[in-house]
Amino acid sequence: MPKLKSVRGAVKRFKKNSSGCFKHKQAYLRHLLTKKSTNRKRNLRFKSIVSKGDKNLVVRCLPYA
């Protein structure tokens, strides 16, 4: 059986941690930042965990993660 290819965009966006969850950078921190509060921007800086409903999609994109 041939090797499965990973989705290259998913490789760049998601990292698997030791507990098997995937972490990713949060959105809404690229532009139009003047109207967003400092507290909101600070919270967006940190990584977020992929939800249970989306985890299977990420796993299918990253077969060897």
Curated annotation (Swiss-Prot):
GO terms for cellular component: cytosolic large ribosomal subunit. HAMAP family: Ribosomal_bL35. GO terms for molecular function: structural constituent of ribosome. This is Large ribosomal subunit protein bL35. It comes from the Bacteria. InterPro entries: Ribosomal_bL35, Ribosomal_bL35-like, Ribosomal_bL35_CS, Ribosomal_bL35_sf. Keywords: Ribonucleoprotein, Ribosomal protein. Belongs to the bacterial ribosomal protein bL35 family. GO terms for biological process: translation.
